[in-house]
Structure formats: structure tokens, C-alpha cells
Curated annotation (Swiss-Prot):
This is Probable E3 ubiquitin-protein ligase XBOS34. It comes from Oryza sativa subsp. japonica. The gene is XBOS34. Keywords: ANK repeat, Metal-binding, Repeat, Transferase, Ubl conjugation pathway, Zinc, Zinc-finger. PROSITE patterns: ANK_REP_REGION, ANK_REPEAT, ZF_RING_2. Gene3D superfamilies: Ankyrin repeat-containing domain, Zinc/RING finger domain, C3HC4 (zinc finger). Residues 309-378, 423-455 are annotated as: Disordered. One of its GO terms (biological process) is protein ubiquitination. The keyword Metal-binding applies. Residues 309-327, 335-355 have a biased composition (Polar residues). A zinc finger (RING-type) spans 462-501. InterPro entries: Ankyrin_rpt (IPR002110), Ankyrin_rpt-contain_sf (IPR036770), Dendritic_Spine_Reg/Scaffold (IPR050889), Znf_RING (IPR001841), Znf_RING/FYVE/PHD (IPR013083). It is an enzyme of class 2 (transferase).
């Protein structure tokens, strides 16, 4: 009688057969989906290695199979590694869309993207890069000597396909490491250069120039890269590229455009074009939703727009400037946007009658007719504007904030402190300090008597054990710090006086007389 197979092993066999209905039936009976064969492969890994089992991959993922299950060994890894190695683009898209981690490395320290590049699967490379890249698009690179740029700059640039990729998943505890990957063409699977941006010095482009560029200096190889937008003067694309180099993902999709001298792709590869489109991650979508919600709440509360709105007049710069009067302390020229109109500003005239002071007794109709007759009048858009928000001011200073007289410091109390030391036999205190009219004439005996009668201070105890009375003194500093047992212990360990940390040459016992 043979051994009965488990339900998990039956699921593995149904995957090899491509029987999706059988897999669902076994799963309904409680069968697991993570059975491992003798080679370490799970059912999802087996289905990810065959192009005809794309429907089985879909069923296993829907039933709860672990897309990041790891298979140890050389040229192994997760199901995404196996699909990328086989060049199965649809399977790669399916795994990535259901939470497969593209940053997991196998035992050879290779990611799924590395395996796809090594095997030459261009479509899989573009699919993975389109999912995780911060920027991908055509750029121009200067490859000639720097002194020739002034003579023939158009002949010293070449088109490249630039992709900015993170090396690992986003982690809030450490900065994100980015790589700039340069391909000579879109159909190339292996990059021409890989630049580690966290080891490079990035120069910000000067957008005031006609044709700005981004300069990247690799400190490790001492190589300088100068990149320009594919269209001369396209500052928007250069801004996207520079922001991606700084770690800011781009929401705008960078659809790759074929260069003029590139061969036409095959129809099969053209169908994979949407895979190159950069899609924002879940964190970016949540951040965009939060920003939009804050903007809508600000509009609903009537917060005025802080961006200045310049108005143009027909006076050929001979009219009054649109700046506020009294060096910026006058009333604003534009009113706050209304709730119903969103961010539509209400444009008013930059100058008014009598420099902001209207003649009393004139109505609004008379003033409007005067403005219509003037040449530098502007059209006023009727909007329901909210009253201007009060400008916060600093609180007034109190009268006694500043003092002109001399500074009065507190007086120093010169009264001596009473110090009481009990005797070793438990008797009365024998030494103290007594305040007297003339401190130099005070006698020790009188001080001891006063100290024994005063109950202001507790009897002296050992500062180390806080239990025994003070019995010894440290020589040469003379501090009466503690009992003999504690002081002997400190002397044997050569720790020094517990009060002043001075070196102890001798410990003497004190006797009360």
C-alpha cells in the first residue's frame, strides 16, 4: 500500500498540469500553497518559470500565495527572479502589481533587474525600471573635450536613455541611495554606465541660461558627466531630471520617444511600451492626496493666496507702480480670493484717487466713472471677496522691560554654617561652628556647645554608606568624609578622597574629647 500524498503536494502537481480549477478546489479544502519540492521551489515559482502558466500565477496570487517566498541557492531567489531570468514580461508585471519586492537579492547578490540585464531581456528590464524608477527618458550627454564645446557643441553630444533608480526600498531611517543608469539606446539591455549618485557631487543647473545642463562629478572615478535635455532649452525636463537626482519622484509619466536615427521596434515590443511608463508609488499617491486635501481646506477657510499678482497697464510704464504705498505698509492692492471662486484673484486698480484718499462726499459711481475715463484703468472682476484677515502684530513691550539703572545683585550671606559631628561612642556632638559678633575671637569649646544644643542640622554621617557616623579624615586634604571601614576600603582601591578626589596618603581616626 503506497503512501498517500498531502494536499499541498497535490497543489504542486496541479500547477505543473496547469489545472487552475483543481488548485481552487484543493485550496477550498484547506490545502496550503507554500509546499517546497526537493529543489526548493514553491508552486508559484514553478508557474513563474513557464509562459503558458500565466493564468495559474494569477490564481495562486488571488488565493494568497507568498509572492516574496525565497529559494536559497545560486541563480535562485524569489518568483520574480525566475520570471525575469526567463524573460516573461507579463508574469513580471503581474508579480510587481501584487507586491513583489524588486530589491530582494539572491545568494549571488543579484536582483531580478540584474538577471534580466544579464540575460538580455530588454522588455523585462524596461518593465522593472518603469515600476521603480524616479526618472526615465531621453537626455543628451557631452562626450568631447571641454574646450571644444565653444566651437561645435552640437557635434559633441549624443542621445542617451537615462534612468534614475533606487538601490533599495525606501527607509525613513537612512537616506535613499540612487543610481543613474545610462543606456546607449532604448533597445539596450545592459547599461553603458552606472553612476552612484550618493558618491557624486551634483551641480545645480543654471536655469537663467539659454541651454542649461546638469553636471555630475563622480568622486570615485574622477569622471565628470554633463547632461542636457533632449530638446535644446527644455528646462522642464531638466528640472525633472535634477529633482529625481535629489530623490524627488516625478509624477509625470516619461514615455520614451524613439530618436530619429533609431530603428523601428517590432510590433511585439511596441505592445510592451506601457511598461516603461513610470508609475508613482503608493507613498507618493498618499502624499499627493494629503497635499490636495490641505489645499482644498485652505481654500474653504478663505486663506489668501500669497503669490504676488502683477497687473499691467496701458500707460507704457508712465503710470504709478503697482506697489503698495507707504513702503509696503499701505493697504494691499488685491483682495483675498473668495470661497466660491477658488483661487481666482480679484484684480483692482493699482492706483486710486488722491493716492488712496478719496474725496469725501463722492459716491462709488462717481469714482468708477473717473476710472473709466482714465487711460490706465483695468477691468475689475466682480467677485464675492472675504474681508481681509487681520495682520498679526507683536505684543507691546512692558514699561519695566528695560532698566537704565545699575544691576542689583543679591547680597551674600556671610553667616557660618553649623556643622555638628557626633562622637564615635554615640555621645553628644563635640564640634560645631558658632556665629559670633567677632568670628576671629570665637572659641571652639563654645562652638561645640552651641552645636550640640542646636537641632538645625542632622548629625554627621558617612557620605559613602550613609549609615555609620563620621570617624576618619583623609590626609593630606583633611576632609572628614566617612567611617573608618569605608575610608580604608577607598584607600586600598586608591580611589582618592570621596569629596575632592585628592590622593589619600593616610587615614586617621578622630576621637571626641
Amino acid at each position: 500500500m503506497g503512501l498517500q500524498q498531502s494536499k499541498e503536494e497535490l497543489v504542486y502537481q496541479q500547477v505543473n498540469y496547469g489545472n487552475a480549477d483543481g488548485i481552487r478546489a484543493l485550496r477550498a479544502q484547506g490545502a496550503g500553497l507554500e509546499w517546497i519540492d526537493k529543489e526548493g521551489k514553491t508552486p508559484l515559482m514553478v508557474a513563474s518559470m513557464r509562459p503558458d502558466l500565466i493564468n495559474v500565477v494569477q490564481v495562486l496570487i488571488e488565493l494568497g500565495a507568498n509572492v516574496n517566498a525565497y529559494r536559497p541557492g545560486s541563480y535562485c531567489g524569489t518568483a520574480l527572479h525566475h520570471a525575469a531570468k526567463k524573460g516573461l514580461e507579463q508574469t513580471v508585471h503581474l508579480l510587481l502589481s501584487h507586491g513583489a519586492n524588486p530589491f530582494i537579492t539572491n545568494d549571488d547578490c543579484h536582483t531580478a533587474l540584474d538577471l534580466a540585464r544579464e540575460k538580455g531581456h530588454v522588455n523585462v528590464v524596461r518593465a522593472i525600471e518603469g515600476r521603480i524608477s524616479l526618472f526615465c527618458g531621453w537626455m543628451r550627454e557631452n562626450y568631447g573635450p571641454g574646450f571644444l564645446e565653444a566651437f561645435a557643441p552640437q557635434f559633441l553630444t549624443r542621445k542617451i536613455w537615462a534612468v534614475i533608480l533606487p538601490r533599495e526600498a525606501r527607509n525613513q531611517t537612512r537616506p535613499l541611495k540612487l543610481e543613474l543608469t545610462i543606456y546607449p539606446e532604448l533597445q539596450a539591455s545592459k547599461p553603458q554606465a552606472v553612476i552612484k549618485l550618493w558618491k557624486c557631487q551634483l551641480e545645480e543647473p543654471k536655469f537663467n541660461q539659454a541651454n542649461p545642463s546638469v553636471t555630475i562629478f563622480d568622486k570615485g572615478t574622477r569622471t565628470r558627466y554633463k547632461l542636457l535635455p533632449v530638446c535644446e532649452g527644455d528646462k522642464q525636463q531638466l528640472q525633472w531630471f535634477y529633482s529625481a537626482c535629489c530623490g524627488i519622484p516625478q509624477v509625470a509619466s516619461m514615455v520614451p520617444a524613439q530618436p530619429a536615427n533609431a530603428p523601428l521596434p517590432n510590433p511585439s515590443s511596441a505592445s510592451s511600451l506601457p511598461s516603461v511608463i513610470s508609475t508613482p508609488s503608493k507613498e507618493d499617491a498618499e502624499l499627493a492626496m494629503a497635499i490636495n486635501a490641505s489645499i482644498l481646506s485652505a481654500i474653504a477657510e478663505g486663506v489668501p493666496d500669497v503669490q504676488p499678482i502683477t497687473t499691467t497697464t496701458a500707460t507704457n510704464d508712465w503710470g504709478n507702480p503697482p506697489s503698495n504705498s507707504l513702503n509696503g505698509w499701505g493697504p494691499p492692492d488685491t483682495s483675498a480670493p473668495s470661497k466660491t471662486s477658488g483661487q481666482v484673484p480679484v484684480v483692482t486698480s493699482s492706483s486710486s484717487t488722491y493716492n488712496g484718499w478719496d474725496v469725501p462726499g463722492t459716491s462709488s459711481g462717481q469714482s468708477s466713472s473717473k476710472h473709466n475715463k482714465s487711460q490706465n484703468s483695468t477691468f475689475v472682476v466682480p467677485q464675492e471677496a472675504l474681508p481681509s484677515l487681520p495682520v498679526p502684530t507683536a505684543p507691546p513691550l512692558a514699561v519695566g522691560t528695560f532698566y537704565d539703572g545699575p544691576i542689583q545683585y543679591p547680597s551674600i550671606d556671610s553667616t557660618p554654617v553649623d556643622v555638628t559631628m557626633p562622637s564615635a561612642d554615640g555621645g553628644t556632638a563635640v564640634s560645631s561652628a558658632k556665629p559670633a559678633e567677632n568670628e576671629g575671637d570665637a572659641k571652639p569649646a563654645e562652638s561645640d556647645a552651641n552645636a550640640s544644643n542646636s537641632g538645625n542640622t542632622p548629625p554627621g554621617t558617612c557620605v559613602i554608606c550613609l549609615d555609620a557616623p563620621v570617624e576618619g579624615a583623609c590626609i593630606p586634604c583633611g576632609h572628614m568624609a566617612g567611617c573608618m571601614s569605608c575610608l580604608k576600603d577607598i584607600e586600598s582601591k586608591k580611589w582618592g578622597c570621596p569629596i575632592c578626589r585628592a590622593k589619600i596618603n593616610q587615614i586617621i581616626r578622630l576621637y571626641a574629647v
